[in-house]
Amino acid sequence: MTYLFLWLITIMTTEITQLVAQIKQATDYQTNKRILKEKIQTDLHVPYNNGLFKVTPELIAFLATWPADTVYLEDTYENPIELQRLEFLELCQQHYQQAMNAWHIQYDEIKRARKV
């Protein structure tokens, strides 16, 4: 009877330890995912003509559809900045794609580490 009791306690302790490890791993995954997203949000900023802009799909769409070659936009510091639309559009597209590619690669690494 004593051996059975010790055996049950050992199994329960092992299961609890495994459960704690799984919870920690899930928490680490969510934390790492959030930190990565915050990093990428910072990486989405691009300097242009003494201004700093956050590149978003909305900004890219705006630049792609605006009819004039010169446009004035408010930067992240709330300053009006003159932009050469096509030049800035190309810069934004390249910068956005680089940031999204980096995010995708790093996110896959986090997912892979979670499954190990």
Task: Name each model-derived stretch.
Residues 2-116:
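A preference for well-ordered globular domain cores
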